[in-house]
Amino acid sequence: MAGDRAEEEEGEAPPPEARAAAAVERVAAAVEAVAAGAGAGAGEYRNAYRRQLLALSRRIRLLGPFVEELRERRRGEGEGEEEERALAPLADALEAALALLRLGREGSRISLVLERDSVMKKFQGVILQLEQALCDIPYNELDISDEVREQVELVHAQLKRAKERIDMPDDEFYNDLLSVYDKNYDPSAELAILGRLSEKLHLMTITDLTQESLALHEMVASGGGQDPGEHIERMSMLLKKIKDFVQTQNPDMGPPMASRVLDSNGDSRPITIPDEFRCPISLELMKDPVIVSTGQTYERACIEKWIASGHHTCPTTQQKMSTSALTPNYVLRSLISQWCETNGMEPPKRSTQPNKPTPACSSSERANIDALLSKLCSPDTEEQRSAAAELRLLAKRNANNRICIAEAGAIPLLLSLLSSSDLRTQEHAVTALLNLSIHEDNKASIISSGAVPSIVHVLKNGSMEARENAAATLFSLSVIDEYKVTIGGMGAIPALVVLLGEGSQRGKKDAAAALFNLCIYQGNKGRAIRAGLVPLIMGLVTNPTGALMDEAMAILSILSSHPEGKAAIGAAEPVPVLVEMIGSGTPRNRENAAAVMLHLCSGEHHLVHLARAQECGIMVPLRELALNGTDRGKRKAVQLLERMSRFLVQQQEEQESQSQASAQVPPQATPEQVPENDIPEQLDSPASQYPMVV
């Protein structure tokens, strides 16, 4: 029996060459997983350790050729014991590194900073483990080429240096986060602290905030549905403070199609979505609200994804869900529809169900579209022009046409016509793209086709109508947060600023709308300021006709949150016109003017702006705004009143101090005024005894 067991155990042990091959596959799998993560984009590491994570990822990816040579190596019978002994520690180290990189990509950004000591120990441990594993590799026995060996040795040298100096997040950042986490900070400094945190944590967009919220939910779920405890509750509180701050600074941050409507004049105006209409997971307006077994309501797509990920607890309450059944919340859906109609918005459409496919084009319609696309490829300019014009009209007509035209492959063909020497063809093509971009799915197709440089080319060089429609196309595309980055990085902003200065009234409006959307992204604000946007905007604000006043004030409010923008606005002597706007503007312009003033009075030259505001009589309109303004306007007015009050108290104290100092200094007689033998003995002699100096 014992002999049988020994034979069985010997049979289970794989030969050395098999173990070596398994170790190679572990190493390869880890390196490939890191490379796949890097393919998702460097922006995935949007946290305080971005630089360290990118460096670690880059060094591991440099091991790719080493892995390829290991895989190609042939092993003879009995070989592999030393190879397995050398590669097993490397596989362990790479798997630990992969886990750390995943934490950096998917973990809570707030938690990563609060746990910085633990995180830095993980970095040190992984780097030390990798450095030691690479040091012990027997290159000669593994038959590695000299070129690959040099590359691996380079990685080893980099890790050796990195082991000796691993930078931690700066102390100010950590202390800011800790002070809000512990609720131990000066309330007057709260806005400045939250501003620094939102920027350094990369929590500036609705996408970032949603991702962080999901990461915190994941931390709770990984605890087995138990009480999340004070630590996670306090992090959730901290995230809510940052979210409130970011939405206060950029009230139009949310999904633009849900948070901006057109007024009776056709102008775009922002609108705040009530919290009870937002999904607790995505923070977006719910299209298809459903109730889970705990009584909480979520957007159907979000909660289905949560459940499909293996979670069995309610994201909000952390109670275990007794069933995964979802009940439509018809009452809330009706309330959302009524609210949308009251505010001039189109009620949100529920996602199309798989068993209810979107109606396709009829065969005759598809044949017509295909014929037009063939003409777009024609060498005859006249045929190209007429086909582009007809597609432009078809895309304008209805949503179904937009879907069919895009599915037929029109987008790349229209893009090729943006460089046409025929200005009318170019104009029809860019306008057709504008009409196609109205459909949400087409936005992604246009961007992924590399459209932005071609659209910017038209914006710079086309006819005035083509330039205006190019600006409108960029506005349509820029409602998606990720596309703001793409468009801003490809030279669109300076061209939009030029159009804002020299276009027709419609062109200026389209340029202003696009610039507003793009400047919601913090990285684009500096580009716009350096392109000369602030002087143009100040010109619109002071224009006696009031044309584009709403757009100008909205853009000014966004730019004032940027240090360069604050400086440029401050240099334009804005205080008198802002005070006048606070007193007599429209409700939205009053709140934006107050927001700009608040930024100016928080900056480097705040005393100058506070003094100028006092001279212009800001207190009365501020008090009125604090009582009767919009919600955001009231908040800004109250904050400004507090700053003005502190400034006035400080001024009064300085004046009183100067008066007291003057009163304590006795009059000094000089030899020219009083002869030496006439100097009185008493210091309190009547002033009339002294000669008057004129």
From Swiss-Prot:
Gene3D superfamilies: Adaptor protein Cbl, N-terminal domain (1.20.930.20), Leucine-rich Repeat Variant (1.25.10.10), Zinc/RING finger domain, C3HC4 (zinc finger) (3.30.40.10)
The entry's keywords: Cytoplasm, Flowering, Nucleus, Plant defense, Repeat, Transferase, Ubl conjugation pathway
Pfam families per the UniProt record, alphabetical: Arm (PF00514), PUB10_N (PF25368), U-box (PF04564)
InterPro entries associated with the record: Adaptor_Cbl_N_dom_sf, ARM-like, ARM-type_fold, Armadillo, RING-Ubox_PUB, Ubox_domain, Znf_RING/FYVE/PHD
Composition skew (Acidic residues), residue ranges: 1-12
Pathway: Protein modification; protein ubiquitination
ARM repeat start and end residues: 398-438, 439-479, 480-520, 521-561, 562-602, 603-650
Gene null: resulting phenotype: Lesion mimic (spontaneous cell death) phenotype. Expression of defense-related genes and enhanced non-race-specific resistance to rice blast fungus (M.oryzea) and to bacterial blight (X.oryzae pv oryzae). Delay in flowering time under long day (LD) conditions.
Resulting phenotype, residue 290 to R: Loss of E3 ubiquitin ligase activity
Enzyme nomenclature, EC number: 2.3.2.27
GO terms for MF: ubiquitin-protein transferase activity
Induction note: In both incompatible and compatible interactions with rice blast fungus (M.grisea).
Tissue: Highly expressed in leaf, at intermediate levels in shoot and weakly in root.
Purpose: E3 ubiquitin-protein ligase that negatively regulates programmed cell death and disease resistance. Participates in flowering time control by mediating ubiquitination and subsequent proteasomal degradation of SPIN1.
Name of the protein described by the UniProt record: E3 ubiquitin-protein ligase SPL11
Species for this entry: Oryza sativa subsp. japonica
